[in-house]
C-alpha cells in the first residue's frame, strides 16, 4: 500500500509510495512559479500576488494536517496532530526547528518571485534548485546517518552541479541573443519607452496595444519591448548580477528548510526529553507553514509601502481591491502547499536526501517557461544546445537521487 493507517495517523510506508509522492510534488512545485511569473508579466504587483499565495499555501497545510494527521486513535507513541498541538511545552525544540525551516522557505520563495523577473523562469529554478540540492542534500545525508546510498546520491549531486554550469551558460547565451535582437531595433537598449512601443504597434489605447501584443511573434524584439512596458518589474538594462545574486540568495534559503524539517521530525540532535514523542510529519508541517505564512504577510505588507527593486508602491486597500489574476495567485499557493506536504510525506519514508529530488523542478518550470512564455524562442543554435544539455543533466540527476532512496525503519520512537 502506498498510504497506510498506523496508530491513528496516515503515513507513507513503501518506497514506491514515497517516490509517487515525490513525483506529484515535483509537478506541483514546478508549476507554481510559472503562475507567479505569469502574473508579474501581466503587470500584477508581486506584493499582491505573494499575499494571495501565502493564504492558500497555509490553508493547504491546515488541510493536510487535519485530514492525514488527525484521523484515528491517538497513542503516546504516535500522537495525532491535534494531540501534539497541546504538547508544545514538551516538544517545543522540534517546533522551533520546523518554524525555522518555514522562515527559510518563505524568504526563499519571496526572493524567487523577484529573480523570476530578472533572470527568467528556467535559469532561476535551475540555479536555486541546484544550490538547494548541493547544500541541503549533503546535510540531510549525514542527518539521516547514511540512509541513502552515497555512491548514487552524490553522483546525482554532481549532475546537478554540471547542470548549474550549463544553466549559467544558457542564461549568458540567451542574454547575448536578446541584446542582439534589441540592438537591431534600437541603438539604446537600456531605455524602453511607451512611445517606442506605440511606434512599433501604431496604437494609442492600452486595450488595443494588448491585442496587438498577442499578435507579435514570441521572442522577437517587438515582443520583448511590449512585454517590458506591460510587466510589473522593469528589467531591461538592469545588471544581470542583481538577478543572479537574488537567485543565489533564494537557493541558500531553500537549502535550509529541508534539513531543519528533518531535525523537527526525527530529532537527530536529541533535543527532546526522553519519552517525548517526535513530531509527526503533519504537526511539523503545520508549524513550518505557520511561520512561513507569518513571515510572508509581514514582509509583503511592508513591501506594499516600501517596495524593493523599483517596484511600484501600493497599499493594503489597493491590494484588497486588486482581483486581476487573484485566482491564479491562490492556485499557486495551493500547488506550493500540497507540493511541500507531499515532499515531506515522501521524505519521511524514503529519506529527506532523496526527497530533495523534487528540486529537479526546473524540468517542469522550463517546460512552462517555453510553452507559456516563449522563453528561448528565436534564440541561437548555441542557446538551444546548452538548454538541451541542461535538461538532460537534470533528468539524470533526479533519477539518481530517487534511485538512492532508502526506507526508514523507525518513525515514532
Swiss-Prot record:
It is a multi-pass membrane protein. GO terms for biological process: nitrogen compound transport; response to salt stress. Residues 40-50, 113-115, 171-240, 300-326, 374-384 are cytoplasmic. Expressed in lateral roots, rosette leaves, stems, stipules, flower stigma, pedicels and the connective tissue between pollen sacks. GO terms for cellular component: cell plate; endoplasmic reticulum; plasma membrane; secretory vesicle; trans-Golgi network. Optimum pH is 4.7. Residues 1-18, 72-91, 137-149, 262-278, 348-352, 406-413 are extracellular. It is found in: Membrane. Keywords: ATP-binding, Membrane, Nucleotide-binding, Transmembrane, Transmembrane helix, Transport. InterPro entries: UPS_plant, Ureide_permease. Pfam families: Ureide_permease (PF07168). ATP binds at residues 232-239. Its main location: membrane. One of its GO terms (molecular function) is xanthine transmembrane transporter activity. The chain crosses the membrane at residues 19-39, 51-71, 92-112, 116-136, 150-170, 241-261, 279-299, 327-347, 353-373, 385-405. Proton-coupled transporter that transports a wide spectrum of oxo derivatives of heterocyclic nitrogen compounds, including allantoin, uric acid and xanthine, but not adenine. Mediates transport of uracil and 5-fluorouracil (a toxic uracil analog). This is Ureide permease 5. It comes from Arabidopsis thaliana (Mouse-ear cress).
Amino acid at each position: 500500500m502506498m498510504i497506510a493507517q498506523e496508530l491513528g495517523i496516515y503515513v507513507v510506508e513503501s518506497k514506491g509510495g514515497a517516490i509517487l509522492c515525490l513525483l506529484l510534488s515535483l509537478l506541483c512545485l514546478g508549476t507554481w512559479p510559472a503562475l507567479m511569473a505569469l502574473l508579474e508579466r501581466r503587470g500584477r504587483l508581486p506584493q499582491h500576488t505573494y499575499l494571495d499565495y501565502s493564504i492558500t499555501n497555509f490553508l493547504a497545510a491546515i488541510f493536510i494536517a487535519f485530514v492525514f494527521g488527525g484521523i484515528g486513535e491517538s497513542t503516546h507513541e504516535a500522537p495525532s496532530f491535534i494531540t501534539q498541538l497541546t504538547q508544545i511545552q514538551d516538544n517545543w525544540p522540534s517546533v522551533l526547528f520546523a518554524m525555522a525551516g518555514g522562515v527559510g522557505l518563505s524568504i526563499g520563495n519571496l526572493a524567487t518571485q523577484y529573480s523570476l523577473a530578472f533572470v527568467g523562469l528556467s535559469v532561476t529554478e535551475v540555479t536555486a534548485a541546484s544550490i538547494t540540492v548541493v547544500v541541503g542534500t549533503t546535510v540531510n545525508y549525514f542527518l539521516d546517518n547514511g540512509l541513502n546510498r552515497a555512491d548514487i546520491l552524490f553522483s546525482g549531486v554532481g549532475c546537478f552541479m554540471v547542470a548549474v554550469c550549463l544553466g549559467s551558460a544558457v542564461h549568458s547565451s540567451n542574454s547575448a541573443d536578446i541584446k542582439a535582437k534589441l540592438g537591431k531595433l534600437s541603438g539604446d537598449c537600456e531605455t524602453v519607452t511607451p512611445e517606442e512601443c506605440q511606434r512599433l504597434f501604431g496604437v494609442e489605447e492600452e486595450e488595443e496595444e494588448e491585442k496587438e501584443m498577442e499578435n507579435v511573434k514570441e521572442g522577437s524584439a517587438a515582443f520583448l519591448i511590449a512585454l517590458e512596458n506591460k510587466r510589473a518589474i522593469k528589467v531591461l538594462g538592469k545588471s544581470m548580477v542583481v538577478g543572479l545574486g537574488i537567485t543565489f540568495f533564494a537557493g541558500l534559503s531553500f537549502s535550509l528548510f529541508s534539513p531543519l524539517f528533518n531535525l523537527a521530525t526525527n530529532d537527530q540532535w536529541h533535543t527532546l526529553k526522553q519519552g517525548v514523542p517526535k513530531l509527526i510529519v503533519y504537526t511539523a508541517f503545520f508549524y513550518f507553514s505557520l511561520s512561513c505564512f507569518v513571515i510572508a504577510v509581514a514582509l509583503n505588507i511592508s513591501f506594499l509601502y516600501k517596495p524593493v527593486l523599483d517596484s511600484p508602491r501600493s497599499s493594503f486597500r489597493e491590494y484588497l481591491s486588486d482581483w486581476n489574476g487573484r485566482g491564479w495567485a491562490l492556485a499557486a499557493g495551493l500547488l506550493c502547499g500540497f507540493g511541500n506536504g507531499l515532499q515531506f510525506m515522501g521524505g519521511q519514508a524514503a529519506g529527506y536526501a532523496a526527497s530533495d529530488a523534487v528540486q529537479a523542478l526546473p524540468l517542469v518550470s522550463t517546460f512552462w517557461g517555453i510553452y507559456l512564455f516563449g522563453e528561448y524562442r528565436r534564440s541561437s543554435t548555441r542557446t538551444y544546445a546548452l538548454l538541451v544539455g541542461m535538461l538532460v543533466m537534470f533528468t539524470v540527476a533526479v533519477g539518481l537521487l530517487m534511485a538512492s532512496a532508502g526506507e526508514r525503519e523507525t518513525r515514532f520512537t
